[in-house]
Each structure stands twice: as C-alpha cells, then as structure tokens.
Amino acid sequence: MNYYGNYYGGLGYGYGGFDDLGYGYGCGCGSFRRLGYGGGYGGYGYGSGFGGYGYRSCRPSCYGGYGFSGFY
C-alpha cells in the first residue's frame, strides 16, 4: 500500500506501471487492463497518471496521481 508504487518505469512488482507489471496500484499510461487500483490505458479503479482519479484515466507519466498512484 505504498503511495509511491513505481513512478516512471514499471520497476515496481505487483504495482503495475509502464510495463504492466503485476497488478494493484499502477500509474501512468502503461497499465493495460489493470484491475483494482490500476491506471493508464484501459486500467480502471483508483489512480492513474497525471492527477487522474476515478475510472479509466489514461495520462502519461505518474505525476501527482490521485489515490494510490505515482508519488502523490
């Protein structure tokens, strides 16, 4: 439940990201079909990239993602 899952490259494990790694708290445009607290392209749940919050918020990078995304 880290607020800084993986901002920038999907280095996080189980936190999804640019490389769609695992699932959970994703960030930025990269988490494809990430359920739960994902984000990015097609990801729905909480979080996402550029201040995206709610469902299906596709924003590049992970700057101030609302919820559990990026390093808010």
UniProtKB/Swiss-Prot annotation:
Keywords: Keratin, Repeat. GO terms for cellular component: cytosol; intermediate filament. Belongs to the KRTAP type 19 family. In the hair cortex, hair keratin intermediate filaments are embedded in an interfilamentous matrix, consisting of hair keratin-associated proteins (KRTAP), which are essential for the formation of a rigid and resistant hair shaft through their extensive disulfide bond cross-linking with abundant cysteine residues of hair keratins. The matrix proteins include the high-sulfur and high-glycine-tyrosine keratins. Interacts with hair keratins. PANTHER family: KERATIN-ASSOCIATED PROTEIN 19-3-RELATED, KERATIN-ASSOCIATED PROTEIN 19-5. This is Keratin-associated protein 19-5. It comes from Homo sapiens (Human). The lineage of its organism: Eukaryota, Metazoa, Chordata, Craniata, Vertebrata.
